[in-house]
Amino acid sequence: MKTKFKHIWLFILLLILGNSIAQENKKNIYIVPIQDTIDLGIPSFVKRAISIAESNNSELIIFDIDTFGGRVDAATQIKDAISATDITTIAFINRRAISAGSLISLSCDKIYMTDG
């Protein structure tokens, strides 16, 4: 429960910060964190984020990924949601994308990684 609450607050914070940065650059970019264990709560979070980005005519969605993995069925739902959007998607692998995280990353249009 704490993880879901943390994800929701982080998502709201990133939306606010992402929107303020995008306003300065006149681009509509959304950053969606996918961190910690991939469980069955994450797909609805990602679907909601994609829906918000679509309704706001976003040009780009960046998925900030740092996970050891988790449930493959949840990752498959996330993959399907990412594949269904017409918005350009980027997986930013911030340290690790193992197992389910790899599947999610591969569903994006582009993948970028940090060292390590």
Where are these regions (language model features)?
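Eukaryotic low-complexity, proline/serine- and acidic-rich intrinsically disordered regions
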Residues: 2, 21-22
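Bacterial N-terminal signal peptides that target proteins for export
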Residues: 1-9
